Amino acid sequence: MSGKISEEAMQEQAERAEYVKNIGIEYRFGCYEEKRPESCQLLGEYMEALQQNFQAAVAIFKKNCDENSYPKSCFKYGMYMLAGKVGDDASLSKMIRPMKIACDANIPQGCRYLSLVHWNGEKDRKADSEKAERYMRRACELEDGEACWLLSTWYMGNKEKFKTNAAGEAKELDRAELGSLSRDMDKSLQFAIRACEMDIPQSCANVSRMFKLGDGVPKDLDQAKKYADRAKEIMETLRSNDTNAGFTG
């Protein structure tokens, strides 16, 4: 019986390997022979996820962005640049073109990262607060909760640093200049509430703090409790999801 199971398992494994191989052939043909940008994107994702060949994936995304201006590939390429996996040049400026293409195609995170590039100045490029605000607003309009939250903190007058890398890890970048917006607590509250409605717990906590302290808005302890409770509820849900992530029943 065990021999039969082993034989069946081996056959299934062989069939899966053949399927994966055929998918790769199909994507290569679509990309290189038929010159279809969407096939190149799929090929890049195939090399990234199934072959774990990140160098090849980056090259495919870059070419598809440079030659075809394909938004998804441009976003992928931009994120690889942010993660420091594209050569030795750490210049954020090179992210502007690919992220602009992604943003123009309504990829929310593309707008958010494009905004953050403009928010963070470099030695040879000053921060552009106007563009940073514009693109962060666009990301928020596209229902990117993180963008709404960041925008709300900017309107508090804080100089937030670019802290998120491609892996979602905190990383403080040493930049000579950061953008700044005039303090506007009405706008800060507006975008903080919007981010809270998109389940960003730290934004709910910010709203609670504003109402509790009367920071730029009328003091309202009932509203403070409401948003504090909402922050706790979201955090409990996130913890529960993390706990159950590996449960298959």
Swiss-Prot record:
Keyword Repeat: yes
Record Gene3D superfamilies: Tetratricopeptide repeat domain
A cellular-component GO term for this protein: mitochondrial intermembrane space
Spans of repeat Sel1-like: 37-69, 71-107, 108-144, 201-236
Cystine pairings recorded for this chain: none
Keywords for the protein's UniProt record, in alphabetical order: Repeat
Pfam families cross-referenced by the UniProt entry: Sel1
InterPro entries: HcpB-like, Sel1-like, TPR-like_helical_dom_sf
Keyword rRNA processing attached: no
Database matches in PANTHER family: CYTOCHROME C OXIDASE ASSEMBLY FACTOR 7 (PTHR13891:SF1)
Family: Belongs to the hcp beta-lactamase family.
Protein name, UniProt field: Cytochrome c oxidase assembly factor 7 homolog
Organism: Caenorhabditis elegans
Gene coding for it: coa-7
